[in-house]
Amino acid sequence: MKFFALFIQRPVATTLLTLAITLSGVIGFSLLPVSPLPQVDYPVIMVSASMPGADPETMASSIATPLERALGRIAGVNEMTSTSSLGSTRIILQFDLSRDINGAARDVQAALNAAQSLLPSGMPNRPTYRKMNPSDAPIMIMTLTSDTFSQGQLYDFASTQLAQKIAQTEGVSDVSVGGSSLPAVRVELNPSALFNQGVSLDAVRQAISAANVRRPQGSIDSSEQHWQVQANDEIKTAEGYRPLIIHYNNGSPVRLQDVANIVDSVQDVRNAGMSDGKPAVLLVISREPGANIIATVDRIRAELPALRASIPASIELNIAQDRSPTIRASLDEVERSLVIAVALVILVVFLFLRSGRATLIPAVAVPVSLIGTFTAMYLCGFSLNNLSLMALTIATGFVVDDAIVVLENISRHLEAGVKPMVAALRGVREVGFTVLSMSISLVAVFIPLLLMEGLPGRLFREFAVTLSVAIGISLVISLTLTPMMCAHLLRAQPTGKQQRIRGFGKVLLAIQQGYGRSLNWVLGHTRWVMVVLLSTIALNVWLYISIPKTFFPEQDTGRMMGFIQADQSISFQAMQQKLKDFMKIVSADPAVDNVTGFTGGSRTNSGSMFISLKPLSERSETAQQVITRLRGKLAKEPGASLFLSPVQDIRVGGRQSNASYQFTLLADDLAALREWEPKVRAALSKLPELADVNSDQQDKGSEMALTYDRETMARLGIDVSDANALLNNAFGQRQISTIYQPLNQYKVVMEVAPQYTQDVSSLDKMFVINSNGQSIPLSYFAKWQPANAPLSVNHQGLSAASTISFNLPDGGSLSEATAAVERAMTELGVPSTVRGMFAGTAQVFQDTLKSQLWLIMAAIATVYIVLGILYESYVHPLTILSTLPSAGVGALLALELFDAPFSLIALIGIMLLIGIVKKNAIMMVDFALDAQRNGNLNARDAIFQASLLRFRPILMTTLAALFGALPLVISSGDGAELRQPLGITIVGGLVMSQLLTLYTTPVVYLYFDRLRSRFSKKPLMRLE
């Protein structure tokens, strides 16, 4: 009593305390960062190594394997995958969520240093690493286009100036430049002219290397002056290389221009980029794991004026994609839902109380509780994201409950003629324990969530803490500010003035009277009610088993990723045309706003596309519906496939695959893997539960396999190294010299002329000059024939691996897809030497699925323990928890009705319902116990009286919670697909629970009271 009186009798102190909470919350709100979701990125580090000209199998065995053995010893690595392709190896290390990425980076560097001695000596550079996840969608894509500058020059500006500056921005991990390559002097050799002049390709290479050197020449010092010695030892342009003498033939000089075409071009001509149908160079910007997208994008945009000023005016620098607008729009929608929820909740209170003064009290309590939460969010390092704002939206219906219970009870005493100050003290004292029980038991629901490990635990920690803090502040406000305002604002009013909204008052009274009559009948037919209650328990089990499940609601972020996979033997020219064709088809879709893409590099049969959709206000289809519409058009393109996936704010794993979900096959024997992977892929392609099934196994590339006749070579005086050098010089785009410029270094690239790289018959024109100076055609000592060769070799851990990727068809669920995959693997009879496992998001989904029921049971057990402690009873918590089955049925039926799968968001809705619906039972049980103890009523009369007495606050708090969640259900803007499952679950559960628990709770109370009376004579107790 003294505690409550302290605040009621000191209104100034209570008001100032409230203002302090509000002010600190406003400051905290202004300091909070903005992000789409809580920080749940796994620490991922990418290791890169290169050895130009090496085939994929050589890269895998000589580079990937030694590095994997060293990196695999690092503590905290939970997944290590590698891909080795022509001349390059990439190893992805995914660490535990708890691992600090900077500490992991130091361990990676130490492992690379330790493995250096095991790597081939021919590597031009040491392996490097970056703190980035290659599977994460870029946060921004910029394009450079120009009508006057070449693609190589644009690439030079992009890599030398723009990429360097952008990479220095806080939060940026990598800036990948695509669509071309650095400028270079290309020497395109004519094999026939070389043969006629008796000059080998290697002689040309040596002559160019010797003619372009950069060495210190020293200085000259006299007694009075100092001179630096500088010679024209470098050749920097194609014009300078043309007259270079490379050989003398019978005393006549053979110049480079006599046997080759020398042009200013690019290092790798097998690269192409496009944006909206025009050639373009792309700047693909990725963030560090854990970096805030909005803050990073804002920093990059702030640099845009300086970036544009650093390049010529005839070059256009545009932003083709930016992930931040849809994130901001989604957060704006959540904030709008929050405001609507507050307004609806206050409207509910006004309709019930029918008094402006009375409504003002919860109208103050709700925003104070919500605003005060921002302080705790800032101190905990949280952000304003979809989940934390959804927590506040849902909290609107919770935080008003405490104020309503206190306000309604004080109003009841005022209507009985008690003075305001006495009514406030008496009213808050009577329901103080009830409010405390409701709040503590609601917070207890989130304890299992806070203790949950892995990605789901990290994902919902902010949600749980934010909601718990809001409830805690609401508890304080309802026991301090609310009774103080009641004592000073409320007055007993004449009956006529109370009924300002007469229609609603009459309806409410009629409902209450009808409830009393129906409850009286129910209490006389308790067996039927128990049958209904037991039926809801069974129905819960059946609905949970049958409902489709998924990991996380598929978001429409307005961005899509496209991955092109063509025939493994396709040429670069044909692949470039495929890119153009696919971009044309996608660009023609009315929902598409912008398309960029590129192809080339080490894998000539693949390409990437980045698609921006129009804002939701300008299109009627979701991203998934756009993909479904495009899928039919894209299937008509022969020789290649384009796989489209909507960009998600959360993606698990470091694999860069062609679809959203992955199933990995592992084997110690590469031959077994190559035998079974096509069979598994073919079986999965037939499953209707899957779409866009594809594989990263690339073992059917075309190669020309040469067989050396070593005896003939020995007789002719030719070494294998001479023959290999010939092939590398002719077809390897070999970088044979370096041109040094102030801002960058450029290469001299040697290769046969383009017409000779497009026909296998060019091998007949190749020759080697032996030790006797004779020109020996390649065909004299080698034979060749077509064969298959891998374009890439993949590992997971130290095992050979192949990842089959898939998407879901429109309306499909991940649970149905994973179950179908497991059935297919069983029916195929895959041997034990080939192991199958889900990876990435699919793996986390399966792990989460196993723990969902345990999580719900843990929440129920926690609430039971808390209630048992509060009531000093084993029985009364069971009465209160009997409200849960009906809520579960309502939630699951609502999800089925709206065709929404059961996701992590829906799981949180179920957890919230555990906390919400038991409030009704707490109010009934608490008043019934008080009536039995102090009013000398029997159990039936006590629970009947309590049910009628608390009917109005029960109805009010339920409607407040329902209307607080309603804006999430009806939302239709950006991010609605993330909010709707939570709202649907809560609204469905509340409606069903309200209809049933008003009857089941009194019946269960009576049953347990009879059991208590039969087995124990201990008097009823309630903690004060």
Swiss-Prot record:
GO terms for cellular component: plasma membrane. Its main location: membrane. It is found in: Cell inner membrane. InterPro entries: AcrB_DN_DC_subdom, Acrflvin-R, Multidrug-R_MdtC. The chain crosses the membrane at residues 12-32, 333-353, 360-380, 387-407, 431-451, 463-483, 528-548, 853-873, 875-895, 897-917, 953-973, 984-1004. It is a multi-pass membrane protein. Keywords: Cell inner membrane, Cell membrane, Membrane, Transmembrane, Transmembrane helix, Transport. Pfam families: ACR_tran. GO terms for molecular function: xenobiotic transmembrane transporter activity. Belongs to the resistance-nodulation-cell division (RND) (TC 2.A.6) family. MdtC subfamily. Part of a tripartite efflux system composed of MdtA, MdtB and MdtC. MdtC forms a heteromultimer with MdtB. PANTHER family: MULTIDRUG RESISTANCE PROTEIN MDTC, PTHR32063. This is Multidrug resistance protein MdtC. It comes from Yersinia enterocolitica serotype O:8 / biotype 1B (strain NCTC 13174 / 8081).
